[in-house]
Amino acid sequence: MKRGVLLVGHGSHLSANSSAPVYQHARTLRERGTFDEVRTGFWKEEPPLSRALESCDADDITVVPIFISSGYFTDEVVPREMGLTGRVTHVRGKTVRYTPPVGAHPALARVVVHRAEEAGAAPGDALAVLGHGTPRNPRSEQNVYAQAKAVAAIGRFAEVTTVFLDQEPNMRDVFSLVSAETVVMVPLFIADGWHVGETIPEDMALDGPETRRGGRRLRYAAAVGTDNSIADVIEELVREASAW
């Protein structure tokens, strides 16, 4: 029996950065050779979700959403477009397993810590997990808080807090939420796209990877979704789904 993995993402007709992490992690998984086949599919790019399974030769396929949290796309769009009816669907003689998104897995906390350390975080620093936030999807907020709690449980940093782009507590107030002299802010986003690369730095008036304000320092990390160790999270999701 051939085992395959299908990574699905949103994609964009306007920005290649949107799909770049999906392709990146697919390449990593292929190089590792853990699975017989690794494919990709998108909502806004080719190959489309509606035809993604057609490209798979494997008999047992695990579909992994490259999204930060569960919501409209993972709960409705992906299953509808791919004809999935639950965690396990049998389609044209194939067994298709559908996992939760990578961003909701507990192992993502290790990726957040890694991103912070890459940005120069030290044990005495504060870490701020930065989420998008949206009133349309309360699970988005809940997932950010859950990841921050998991990061705090690792015990690597003096303080761990949560901030958002589009809701309270707002990222602009990050210094008032912690007492540490240095704060490392890690974006809980999949891609280094428009928000991570433009709107957040502009709204925060960041000077670059490091910004100094009133004797304090803010370090801005790269998005968690582009970290190479996301491939480890994907493998863990596939391993868990194989027991279904």
For the regions a protein language model found, what residue spans apply to each?
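Active-site-proximal alpha-helix that buttresses catalytic centers in soluble enzyme cores
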Residues: 1-244
